[in-house]
Every structure is written in structure tokens, then in C-alpha cells.
Design a protein with these regions (language model features):
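Phosphate-binding/switch region of NTP-binding enzymes
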Residues: 161-247
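Conserved inter-motif catalytic segment of the P-loop NTP-binding fold
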Residues: 71-141
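P-loop NTPase motor core
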Residues: 120-192
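Localized chelating/binding microdomains
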Residues: 24, 33-52, 80, 146, ...
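Hydrophobic/aromatic beta-strand patches that form the interior of the parallel beta-sheet core
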Residues: 39-41, 72-74, 99-101, 171, ...
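The Walker A/P-loop phosphate-binding site
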Residues: 1-91
Length: 247
């Protein structure tokens, strides 16, 4: 008598699932994030709208391209608002499964990431952490240059290791701060620590996405040829956000 073996998906198979932008132009270059990634997205302020949409899409079932997961969202220096979303889900509110934590200083960001992030991820059972404008508190806060460089580097290392250890995806946006004298130094640190780096650029005539760094994907540049709502402004309500304000 023959026995039929029913094979359950292994953890390694589960972790190979790709979490995409759901933007065809980008997917041809970058097939998606996977568990263990610490990714950085460089670009203009509008990039935070894209990050917000990723927070919403992560809640979708896997067969719709989501992670079936809650999300931890860290808003640095009030650079973004999850209420700027006009997006429909089969849920009462697309933000009800997002823990929104806001920080305004380098000290509070350091404390949140190093001391409180693990509890937040475990309590939320989150598979995705999104950090908006991650360098901002260190670029403009009243911290001396050497301390800012040292502590920021520690945070980047911690996030890279945290993503691998807990098998989650961490995506940080790094907005344009060309006027800050620390900007180039912190960008170098960020690029060195992240395993995935994407740069979004916009001119009067073109919109481009460049994959600057990835452990396995081929690097390159792609034009954004279609209209994508994720790169425009959104309107919505913040009633269901879970807010933690860390001054």
C-alpha cells in the first residue's frame, strides 16, 4: 500500500516569498524584498507616500502580494503621515494594523530602535518595519559630529542584524538633505550597512529607479513610464492609527 506524503512548506520556503512594490516598471528591475532584508530607499519627500503604501500592502493576504502581517511604522521628525493614504482594503480601516511611532530627536530614535523595537515587533507580530526619513534626527539634532556618526552607525548595524535575526523586512527611507554637512557621511554609512539600496530620482522629464546594491539581483536603472499613485499625494483619515509620540 502506497502512502502519500503531504509536504508542508518549510521555513526557508516561506522566507523566500517576495514582497513587491506592485509597480510593473520597478518589478522588472527589483523583484521584491524578502525576510531578512534591511533596505534603504533614497529619494524625494514623495517617497514616503510609497513607503506608506507598503505598510498597507503588507496587510494583504499572500495570494494578493501581501505579508498577512501587522506593521511597525517609525516616523522620524514628523516626515510622513500614514493618514496620507487613499487606498482600499477589505478591512474597516487600512491603518488599524499599523503601529505608528513618532520620534523627533536622535536620542529618542536611538532609544526606540535599540530598546523598544523588539517588543514592538513581537507584540504586533509584525513582519515589516518601515522607518521614514531615518537620518533626519541625526542631520539636524544638537549632537556633535563624531557622536552622530558613531551612534548612527550602531543603529544601522543593529537594524541589519535585527532583520536577519527575526526574519522580517525593514525598509527605511532616506530623504534628500543636501544642505546638511553630515549628509554624505551618513549616506555612506547607510549604504554600507543595508543589504538593499534603491534610489528614486526625478527630473523635469524623467523618473528613474536605480538598484544600487543587492546581494543577488543584477544592478541597474529603470524608467518609470506609467502613472503610479504611490508616488503622488494621498488623502485619508488617521482615526485608526495607533500613535506613540516620543519627544
Amino acid at each position: 500500500m502506497q502512502q502519500k506524503l503531504i509536504m508542508k512548506p518549510s521555513m526557508s520556503q516561506t522566507l523566500l516569498t517576495r514582497f513587491t512594490f506592485n509597480i510593473p516598471d520597478i518589478e522588472g528591475l527589483f523583484p521584491g524584498f524578502k525576510a531578512g532584508d534591511f533596505a534603504v530607499l533614497y529619494g524625494p519627500q514623495s517617497l514616503n507616500s510609497l513607503a506608506s503604501i507598503l505598510c498597507v500592502r503588507a496587510q494583504l493576504p499572500a495570494n494578493l502580494g501581501g505579508l498577512e502581517s501587522n506593521v511597525v511604522f517609525i516616523d522620524c521628525a514628523n516626515s510622513s503621515s500614514l493618514s496620507d493614504i487613499q487606498f482600499q482594503l477589505d478591512a474597516k480601516d487600512p491603518l488599524e494594523r499599523v503601529l505608528n511611532m513618532r520620534v523627533y530627536t536622535a536620542y529618542r530614535l536611538t532609544s526606540l530602535i535599540m530598546e523598544k523595537l523588539q517588543d514592538a515587533v513581537e507584540n504586533q507580530d509584525a513582519k515589516l518595519v518601515v522607518i521614514s526619513d531615518i537620518a533626519c534626527p541625526f542631520l539636524y539634532d544638537n549632537v556633535n559630529d563624531q557622536e552622530a556618526k558613531t551612534v548612527y552607525s550602531q543603529i544601522m548595524s543593529y537594524l541589519a542584524n535585527f532583520a536577519k535575526k527575526h526574519h522580517i523586512i525593514i525598509i527605511a527611507t532616506y530623504l534628500t538633505h543636501e544642505s546638511s554637512r553630515r549628509n554624505s557621511v551618513l549616506q555612506e554609512i547607510t549604504t554600507a550597512k543595508a543589504n538593499t539600496v534603491l534610489r528614486f530620482t526625478k527630473t523635469l522629464y524623467t523618473k528613474e529607479v536605480e538598484l544600487e546594491k543587492h546581494p543577488t539581483y543584477m544592478l541597474g536603472v529603470v524608467d518609470l513610464t506609467t502613472e503610479n499613485h504611490a508616488l503622488t499625494e494621498f488623502m485619508g483619515t488617521d482615526k485608526a492609527e495607533q500613535n506613540c509620540f516620543l519627544m
